[in-house]
Amino acid sequence: MIRLLFISHTGNNEPPMAQCIMDHLIQKAGLTDSLSVSAAAFAKEGAPLSKAAQETLSAHGIPYTMKKAFPIAWKTYDDYDFILLMNDKNNPDIFNTMGGDVDEKIHLLSEYAGKEADIPNPHKGGTFEDAYEEEEKACEGLLKKLEAWIR
């Protein structure tokens, strides 16, 4: 089982839409026995998806759950195979909280869409639709890579 962890934008405690998008893509590809998806945040307590995020996902036919993002802890690094950030790969909180990236598990999600940029933050000037589009492209790219390993 390959375990994926999506980490919220810095300063946001709700799970990224990417968690729901990837979960949906995994189910469509029939890979639920091979891949699992979770979400975390740098907050002490996570929050469920915002109403705007729920509406954006619904508009694209993506089911969502009301699960909260869990707070990142030191052991989080060891529990996941891929740790996917929405923004700021050089955020010191990542390394202070998880102790670094010796196994090179931490990546910007956008890398899987062929970009080196942050995913637009819908809580700080970006739109939920912009964030959805970037997250979807990146999740599709990541799934393609993972499928090649699994199959």
PLM regions and their residue ranges:
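Phosphate-binding/catalytic loops
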Residues: 82, 88-151
